[in-house]
Amino acid sequence: QMCIRDRGWGRFRNEQICRLKIRRIKEEWAQNLVARPWCISEVVRAHEDCPELQAILDEYHKPVVIQDEVLGELTLDKDYDAFEGEIQWCGKGVRLSLEVNAESKPSWTRARNAAKRLVTDQETWDKAMRDFAAKNLTGLANNWLSQDEESARDPETAPITEEEFAQRILLTEVSVSPGGRFTAYYNDDDMFWGHAVEVSGSLKKGITYANLAG
């Protein structure tokens, strides 16, 4: 069994430029691994001046912003490989996240095109997502209601209906991938005690999944 030592963890901060000596890990610690990884054998300098690496880091920190005629301003979050922005969805502001490969601009274009198809036909998609979520989760909402000791509403005599469920959930975020898959996140209006309602599908196959998240 591999022995994991705590010594050294937390020694390096994020984006620290340093000079290290590295070597292949000993075979005895890599018996169950496909390939022998590398490990640090010595910290030569904990803080190193390196113009080449500093230039790369400076370039990394430059904001990447796209102006789209439909989606508005989108800013790349390089830590999460996603463009973030806000769109108008059925008259309300909704957060938009485009999942991309930060190093592949074609993926940016595909994700934008997929999102624009979704946004352009938003009324149809909005109804489809709400109806699907209501069909699949209204029963669960009534189950939660029956366990809510603070609610005066009795799910036996005054249950939450699918129509009510569809109207109560509030869209807060839409995430879209280059392949046309998307996930919508809804505020649950406290039907699930603060959990988000997650609805996902694709432009090709339609809505395929609804559940709770968070």
Predicted regions, residues:
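Flexible glycine-rich surface loops and low-complexity tracts that mediate binding to linear polymers
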Residues: 10-34
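C-terminal structured interaction module
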Residues: 161-214
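Long, charge-rich alpha-helical interaction segments
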Residues: 98-101, 105-161, 165
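Broad gene-expression machinery/nucleic-acid interaction feature
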Residues: 17, 35, 82-84, 93-95, ...
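Short peripheral tails and domain-boundary helices/loops at the edges of structured domains
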Residues: 36-67
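Short, small-residue-biased leader/transition segments that mark boundaries at the very start
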Residues: 2-4
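A structural detector for beta-sheet-dominated domains
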Residues: 21-23, 77, 88-90, 97-101, ...
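Contiguous hydrophobic, core-forming segments of folded domains
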Residues: 59-128
